[in-house]
Every structure is written in C-alpha cells, then in structure tokens.
Amino acid sequence: MAAPTRTPRGIWIAAGLRALAAGGPDAVRIEPLAQALGVTRGGFYWHFENRRAFLDELLDTWERRSTDEVLARVEREGGDPRDKVRRAGMLTFSRELLPIDLAVRDWSRRDRSVARRLRRVDNRRMAYLRTLIGALHPEADDVEARSLLAFSLAIGDHFIAAEHDGRSRAEVLELAMRRLLS
C-alpha cells in the first residue's frame, strides 16, 4: 500500500501568501486554504503546529524573499549604484511581492511582533539604500535624506491616486528617481 501523498509545505506557504496578500492575516484560515487546495486540513498539521506557526512561516518567507533574495540578486546582477537602487526597488515592490508587503504593513499596525519584523526588514532595506546612495554622495545628511525619500517614493507610490498632467506614473517615477540619484 502506497503512503498517502501530502501536500508539500511550499504549496501551503504559497496559498497562505496569496491569502495574506488578498485579505490580510484574517484571510489566512486553515479550512478555506485546504478547500482551495482540494485537500484536508490534516496535511496542514503535518507541516505546521498551528495557525500561529503558519503565520510566522509566512512572515519568514516574505522576509527572506523581499530582503535576502532581492539583495542577493541585485548584487549578483551588478551594475552601478543607481542601477542597483532601481533594481532593488523593482524587485522588492514587484507584482508578486508588493501585495504581501502592503498586507504586512497593514498587519503591523495591529500586531507588535509583526511591527518588529517589518522594522527589521525596513532597516535592512534602508541600510542597503544608504550604502548605494553613499557611493554617490559623501554627505551623511544627504545620504539619509535621499535614502528615506527613495524608500518613501517606492512605498508611497502605491497609495497615491493623483494624475500627472499628461505624463504616466512611470515617467514621473523615473524623473523623481533620476533627481534623487543625481
């Protein structure tokens, strides 16, 4: 008799991240995820002790993908500091990672442990920006201001609905980044 096939851990994590991105942590429920995957809840408990452990694993995955993997890829692909800043922003706030990032930011307003984790991630991102922008500008105050503006631009862009007098958002963002990195 063959052993039962278990839904791989990565499948549960991918489904959990999609649920988190779509509806925040309240949308990450075991039974609906199992139904969406066409499996029973039992497979979930083979991989995760409980929902809290699963949520922690989702946060671990988000943190690894949005920092470790992004920074490693940016460094591996190389380029000058301006190229690296742009690439880091595009990867960090990609179609895949942005919805998760925004959900984690919202969640962090209600959960201190999530807020601490978000602070750690943002501190790593800011440290990387400081390093890259510091290679372009020697003045510490200028580096700090430009790093904060670049990071704020990348996050805030997704909350601004304004139009740009005949220009596309992409054109205005590129103009803003050129000025920040000049």
What are the residue ranges of the model-derived segments?
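Short, basic, alpha-helical segments at the C-terminal edge of helix-turn-helix-like DNA-binding modules
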Residues: 60-66
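Helix-loop "lid/cap" segments that line or gate small-molecule binding pockets
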Residues: 87-95, 102-110, 132-135, 180
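N-terminal intrinsically disordered/low-complexity leader segments
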Residues: 1-7
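Solvent-exposed, amphipathic alpha-helical segments
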Residues: 11, 15-23, 69-73, 104, ...
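Hydrophobic/aromatic-rich alpha-helical bundle segments in the mid-to-C-terminal region
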Residues: 115-119, 135-182
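Helix-turn-helix
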Residues: 11, 15, 19-53, 57
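Hydrophobic alpha-helical connector segments
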Residues: 57, 71-98, 150
